[in-house]
Amino acid sequence: MATQQPTQTDNSAQAQPPQTNPAKPTEISEPGIYVALTHDHLNYQSVIDRVRSPEAGAIVVFAGTTRNNFNSLPVQHLSYTSYAPLALRTMLTICRSILTKHGLKGIAMVHRLGVVPIGEESILIAVSSPHRQAAWRAGEEALEECKAKVEVWKREEFGGEGGGVWRANRDGAVGVKVDEPRIGKGEVDEKEDEGDSGNGGNDRKS
């Protein structure tokens, strides 16, 4: 009987976060819940309308925006990527749990992908509830759960010689610096195939 050879793991191929297709925005909706990933600008009104209910006495909206610095370093912009099928399932699971736990009438969670300039929104979360206290608590919990669990990565692009750093969404961990050698296009393509960029630890989205 032939002995099966162990498969060699290519660690370099795991270095980059998985990519999403900009041409295919993705979303999932069910009664009281809406989750989406998109490369478009985020629209407050459309997210609020997703959670409107005649039984709700309060709607709370959280907007995460790109700030112009991180640890005193100037940030030019953020760039987000995601493994969309898994991220959407995680977002849906979070929203289902929070909807039930807090007795909400609606919850919507939309995350932007691609480049997000300074001052623009990278995430919108809206919740509606009969009472404001539950809405406040649910909105905060939804944000923290999203940051801790959803499969979205960001790259911070620093000014000057700072370069770029990949980070995931969890607070407190260190990202991985992206080194981009000044070489020809053909060599760049080859390096990308080898996984030249790193997938960071975990840190803030916004």
From Swiss-Prot:
Enzyme Commission (EC) number: 2.8.1.12
Alphabetical list of InterPro entries matching this protein: MoaE_sf (IPR036563), MOCS2B_euk (IPR028888), Mopterin_biosynth_MoaE (IPR003448)
Record localization: Cytoplasm
Biased composition (Gly residues): 197-206
Bilayer-crossing regions: none
Quaternary structure (record): Heterotetramer; composed of 2 small (MOCS2A) and 2 large (MOCS2B) subunits.
Organism of derivation: Neurospora crassa (strain ATCC 24698 / 74-OR23-1A / CBS 708.71 / DSM 1257 / FGSC 987)
Pathway: Cofactor biosynthesis; molybdopterin biosynthesis
Official protein name in the record: Molybdopterin synthase catalytic subunit
GO biological process: Mo-molybdopterin cofactor biosynthetic process
Compositional bias (Basic and acidic residues): 177-188
Compositionally biased intervals (Polar residues): 1-23
Any one GO CC term of the record: cytosol
Family note: Belongs to the MoaE family. MOCS2B subfamily.
EC primary class: transferase
One Gene Ontology MF term: molybdopterin synthase activity
Keywords linked to the UniProt accession: Cytoplasm, Molybdenum cofactor biosynthesis, Transferase
Catalysed reaction, written as an equation: 2 [molybdopterin-synthase sulfur-carrier protein]-C-terminal-Gly-aminoethanethioate + cyclic pyranopterin phosphate + H2O = molybdopterin + 2 [molybdopterin-synthase sulfur-carrier protein]-C-terminal Gly-Gly + 2 H(+)
Pfam family, one: MoaE
Binding site for substrate: H131, R132, K147, K154, R155, E156
Domain of life where this protein originates: Eukaryota
Region (Disordered): 1-27, 177-206
